[in-house]
C-alpha cells in the first residue's frame, strides 16, 4: 500500500524502520519471526520490485545480522542497484545513537575536521536525502532512536493507528496536510 502510494505521489525515497538495535531485547521467537518475514518478503517480492523499478537500500549494523540474512540483503541490493523510480531504505538493526558514534569515530580515524558535513558524510544515510516527512504510527509520540541527526527539519506526524492498520486514506490525509506546510528550515 505505502509503496504504491509513494509511486503515485512521485515520492522518490521511503525509509522504513523495521528492526531497531534495541529490538534484540525482544523474545527470541519474535526476532526469528521478524527475520523470517523479511527473508520471505525479499525472496518473494524481489522480482516485483525490479519490475517496478524500485531500489532497495539497507541501513544499520548489518554485519551483526544472521549471515543468511546478510547474504540475502547484499543480493537484493545488488539486483536493484540501478533502479530509479523509488528507493526503499530499510533500517535494520539500526540505532541513531550508534550511527552517530560510528560516524564520529570514522571522522576521527580519517583525521579530518569534525563538523556537520564530515559527520553527515559518515552516516549510514550519507547517500540519502534527509526526510521531509516522518509518519510515526501506533499512538507513540517519540522518535525511538530513529534518524536523530537526519530529522532536524523533518515534519513529524503522529498517527494513532498501528502500522498494519495504516491505509491509503490515512497516507493521503497526512500527505495533503504536509503539502500545505510552508517549510522554512529555521528561517522566518
Stretch-by-stretch model annotation:
Residues 1-188:
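Flexible, compositionally biased loop and terminal segments
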